[in-house]
Amino acid sequence: MKSRSYNQYCGLAYALDVVGERWTLLIVREMIAGPRRFKDLLDGLPGISTNLLAERLKNLEQQAVIRRRVLPPPAGSTVYELTVLGQALEKTLLELGKWGSQFVPQSMEGATVLRAGSYALTLKTFFRPERAQGINETYELHIDGEVLHVQIAAGEIQVQQGAAPKADAVFTTDTPSYLQLLAGQLQPDQAIAEERIQITGEPGALDRFLSICGIADVQAETAS
């Protein structure tokens, strides 16, 4: 399919020529947590067709936003990952995600299941570096079968798909409970008592994680 262009001599217009098509930014989002197989992307983007995903990936590859590579044995899978040019979109996506959070409804009813890319974007968007000073911990999250790990060090955050080589704490929960914890709608003690979250490791790590990455305070600041 021939790519369309706004044909405007403007940086924003040219940016939209590259990433403005439907699904494109969500495909980029899915790679924020690391390389993804075609099937991973298809599973993480309910509603996109196989042909359309292939077309969007081809366009992004042609624009050098992503690249394909084959993982070494024993995996041997072909994965898609962001190039340096693609990684430069992260800051823009974080700001766009923060702006878009004011339109997110309270209930997930009718919405599709979240995947690692969406979790990673949310964690990075609402990360509070001023609260992370002096904390050097790695948290492993298991959310309805999705596994990712969050590393906090030197006031910075890194989020990657998959289990951590060495985690200080492992949190296992479901999507509604996880989102309610982040939003401050569910308190950690209540979640533990009701067995809505299981913690392996230091129990206080959950409070630190929510203080650093929770969205309750940010939502209050936005509302004011």
Describe the role of every protein-language-model region:
Residues L85-H149, P203-S224:
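Acidic, aliphatic-rich amphipathic alpha-helical segments
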Residues N59:
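Alpha-helical DNA-recognition elements
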Residues G20, P72-E95:
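Basic, amphipathic "hinge/linker" alpha-helix immediately C-terminal to the N-terminal HTH DNA-binding motif
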Residues C10-S49:
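N-terminal helix-turn-helix DNA-binding core of bacterial DNA-binding proteins
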Residues V65-I66:
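Short hydrophobic beta-strand motif reused across regulatory alpha/beta modules
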Residues R56:
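Residues within the DNA-recognition helix of helix-turn-helix
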Residues A164-S224:
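C-terminal interaction segments
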